[in-house]
C-alpha cells in the first residue's frame, strides 16, 4: 500500500445499500479517471483509502474496491458472484472428479445494454476466456489500449435499472460479493423481512465464517487500517445483519472506527400496513443495536419521517427527482455520503474515523444527522461570501436523516464539507476602497470564510470544516436530476443551454442535533401503540417481548441524550 494511506474497509449490506454503493463506487471510479487531468486539483482525496491493488493469475494489475457486500439470491442480475475481473475458464474447468458428470445450466440474465457498452470500453474477453483490462486509472496497471474513435457512452434509462448491478461501472474482487442463498430478492415468499431473521443469518456458522474469512483477507493486507464503514439497509432484515456485523467488528477489531450509514428508501404509504410496521420495528431495533456497536451511526433517507406517519420526501431547489425510484434516491444519498466522508479520506491532514466519531458523539450521542445542499447555489460572477449570505440565518442544507426540518433545533457538534468551488471564487473580489458588505467579504481565504460563517450560524457549537476544490462528478450513469445548472453545476437563470451537467459543488454536514430527541421519542411512542400480538410473524423471527420492552427503554435513554439542554456549552 503506497503512501501510508489510512485504509477503510467498506461493508454493503442489503439491496438499497447496493444502489447507494453502486453510485458511490462509480463516483470513486470517475474521480480516478480524472486524476491525471491537468485541469483537476491533484491529491485532495486519497483513493488508496478505499481501494486495494492486486494482480490476477495472468499478471494483470488490478485496482478494486476494498469491499464486502451481502445481498439475497436473485439480486445480481447478470453480474457474477465472483465478479468479472479475475475470471478464468481454465480454472473453472479444473474438476477433480473423473466420473460421469451431468451439467445443469441456468439460463443467464440478459446484460443491461448500458453495461455491454461499458465493458466493451473497459476491456475484452479473449478466446482463452481471460478478461484483458485496457487500463487501470490513476497510473495503476498497464498502459491503456487506444482506439481510433471513442464511442459516446450509453446513458442508462430509469426503465432499464432493475437492480444495482445494472449500473455499476466498477469491477469487483472475487472476495467482495457474498450471497445469502436462503432468502430471495424477488417474490413474496422467502424474504428477509425482519430484524431477527437478519441477526440469525450471521449466527449461522456458514455465513459467519464466510464473513470472517473475507474480513481477514482484506484486513491482513492493510498497513494502517483506520476502520470500517457499513452501508446497511435499516427498513428490512438487513438491519439485523448490520447489527450483528457491527458487533463482530467491535469484538474482533477493538480500537478501530466503525461508522454505520443506515439507509432507508422512500417513500412509503399508509396502505401497506405490514410493510410499514416491519419498517418501524426494523429501523428502531437497527438504530439501537448499531449505536451500541458502532463508533457513529447516521440514518440516511429522503423521507420526512422515521415513524409510522408518512411525510413528503425532502425538496431540493435545483434538483428534480422521483422519490419512488431507488436509482434516483440512492444517487442523491451517495452524493451526500461522498461529501461528508471527505475528512477521513483526505491525502493531507486527514481526520481519522475514530477522531471524527469522538468529536460528534460525546455524552453518548452516537447517532448523528446528515444534511446537504445539492448543488451548492453559486451563480456566475458570485463569490463564496455572496452565496453564503443569501442563506441568511436559515440552515443551508436539506435534511437527509428523516428527522424533520432542522429549524428551531440545537446543534451540539458538526463536521462540514464544502467542495467544488473554484479558488477564484473563495473570497470577495471587491474594488479597492469598497467597504465589505459583511464580515465574510473581508476574509482573505476560503477556509476563513467557511469557518467564520459557521461561527456566525452556530456561535457556541464545536465545528470542524473542510473546503475542497474537487467537485462531485455527475456524468452517466448518474441520473439527469439537475435543472438550471451549467456543466460545472453553477446556478443559471432560466433553462440551461448546451452541454449536460458534468460536476457540481456540494455543501454537506454531519450534525449531533436536538432534532434526534423528538425523532427517537416519536419512534418509541409509535412502538408503544403497537399490538405485538398482531405481528407474531415478526416476533417469531427471533425477537422476544422482553426485547421490545428493552428496546423502548434504550430508545428513550438515547433520546434523552439529545435534550436541548445537554451540550458542551450553555
Where are these regions (language model features)?
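Terminal, contiguous helix-loop blocks that mediate binding/assembly
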Residues: 2-570
